[in-house]
């Protein structure tokens, strides 16, 4: 790619002393748009719930505003981290993530919600540790690929070794239990290894093994099997196992093309469980109709496109770690948003996955914003490399 082309596509240039930060304005605009859109919809979906739980209609909107501010701070902090520093500590971060997964399973430390022990309290904020592990897993796999690219491309061992370490995290996630996060982590890793050039037959074989393992896990856990059966025919038991899905489908049916109007949802009024978190997309479909739901899908498609484009730019600049980290973040966010929306629309069995940047929650918001911040850093370093500025042309990092 020519220097002239890079200069024309470098986006917003922020200056700080002698340093510069090359900001992706498209990614910034779309990310802020999703956060603002999510805040409006969380407010709409939770006013009645706040009144019931805390005698304050704006209880959840006020907390979500704090979550957004914390997320912006996390994104700012992540954008300040030098990529070589992150790569150097990628293995340590991975084992720190494993330690968090162990910590949450210790009685008295992990917090149980709806029968799952997935949260710990950090500085007054309830954090879902699986969200943190998704990011550190992507960082670890990117670091592994940058160190062992030839092995990944030529040897079965090159794929099995990182997946075997991730399997440790998968086992701990399943103990919570969190099957959805397990699927996202493993699928993201497989996607990154595939993009690294792993042999097709090895990739297909491992994909088949993962699929078989997933099937076994479904059939050996009654609650997972019940979710799959209710997905196949939610109307067979609409008041029990199929309740969430049937209520979500009713929400989309009521929304039709243009929706019933912002704030006018009926399903959010104690019919649709987790309307402000996992099933926020159903409220969007009901209140804003097909056009609102399609807008959200397009915004997430742009986020994934920018992540992959940033990864390609970093790969051309010669920074493999940055490239595959961007690819991993793109796969993760795209897959998680697809699963969440698919569950809401009845395309997939029910999973406990949030809609990135939109659903209510502080831990998820901070982690996803940190991932977006890393994308900004990756792009800035890649553009600086093409412009010949090197480290001297960047904002100072840690």
Swiss-Prot record:
Signal peptide residues on this chain, from the entry's feature table: none
Location(s) in or outside the cell: Cell inner membrane
Keyword annotations of the record: Cell cycle, Cell division, Cell inner membrane, Cell membrane, Cell shape, Cell wall biogenesis/degradation, Glycosyltransferase, Membrane, Peptidoglycan synthesis, Transferase, Transmembrane, Transmembrane helix
GO BP annotation list: cell wall organization; FtsZ-dependent cytokinesis; peptidoglycan biosynthetic process; regulation of cell shape
GO molecular function: lipid-linked peptidoglycan transporter activity; peptidoglycan glycosyltransferase activity
Coiled coil ranges: none
Cytoplasmic side: 1-20, 79-92, 143-153, 199, 311-318, 377-398
Entry's transmembrane regions: 21-41, 58-78, 93-113, 122-142, 154-174, 178-198, 200-220, 290-310, 319-339, 356-376
Pfam families recorded: FTSW_RODA_SPOVE
GO cellular component, one term: cell division site
Family as reported in the entry's similarity comment: Belongs to the SEDS family. FtsW subfamily.
HAMAP family, A to Z: PGT_FtsW_proteobact
UniProt function note: Peptidoglycan polymerase that is essential for cell division.
Protein's recorded name: Probable peptidoglycan glycosyltransferase FtsW
Gene assigned in the entry: ftsW
């Amino acid at each position: 790619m020519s220097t002239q082309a890079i200069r024309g596509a470098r986006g917003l240039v922020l200056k700080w002393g002698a340093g510069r930060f090359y900001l992706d304005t498209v990614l910034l605009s779309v990310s802020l748009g999703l956060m603002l859109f999510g805040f409006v919809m969380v407010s709409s979906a939770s006013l009645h719930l706040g009144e019931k739980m805390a005698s304050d209609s704006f209880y959840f909107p006020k907390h979500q505003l704090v979550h957004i501010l914390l997320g912006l701070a996390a994104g700012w902090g992540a954008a300040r981290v030098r990529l070589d520093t992150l790569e150097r500590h990628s293995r340590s971060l991975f084992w720190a993530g494993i330690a968090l997964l162990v910590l949450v399973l210790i009685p008295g430390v992990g917090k149980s919600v709806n029968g799952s022990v997935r949260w710990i309290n950090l500085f007054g904020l309830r954090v879902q540790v699986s969200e943190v592990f998704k990011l550190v897993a992507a960082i670890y796999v990117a670091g592994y690929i940058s160190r062992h690219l030839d092995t990944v491309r030529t040897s079965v061992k090159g794929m099995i070794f990182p997946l075997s370490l991730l399997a440790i995290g998968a086992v701990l996630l399943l103990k919570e239990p969190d099957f959805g996060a397990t699927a996202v982590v493993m699928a993201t890793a497989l996607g990154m290894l595939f993009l690294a050039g792993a042999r097709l037959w090895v990739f297909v074989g491992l994909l088949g093994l993962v699929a078989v393992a997933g099937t076994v896990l479904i059939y050996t856990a009654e609650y997972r099997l019940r979710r799959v059966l209710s997905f196949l025919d939610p109307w067979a038991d609409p008041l029990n196992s199929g309740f969430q899905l049937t209520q979500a489908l009713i929400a989309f049916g009521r929304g039709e093309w243009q929706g019933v109007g912002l704030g006018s949802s009926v399903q959010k009024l104690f019919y649709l469980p987790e309307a402000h978190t996992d099933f926020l997309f159903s409220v969007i479909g009901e209140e804003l109709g097909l056009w609102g739901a399609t807008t959200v899908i397009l915004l997430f498609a742009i986020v994934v496109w920018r992540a992959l484009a940033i990864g390609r730019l970093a790969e051309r600049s010669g920074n493999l770690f940055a490239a595959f980290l961007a690819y991993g973040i793109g796969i993760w966010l795209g897959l998680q948003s697809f699963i969440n929306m698919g569950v809401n629309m009845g395309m997939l069995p029910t999973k406990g996955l949030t809609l990135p940047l939109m659903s209510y929650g502080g831990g998820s918001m901070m982690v996803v914003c940190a991932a977006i911040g890393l994308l900004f850093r990756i792009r800035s370093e890649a553009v600086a490399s093409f412009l010949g500025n090197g480290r001297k042309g960047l904002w100072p990092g840690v």
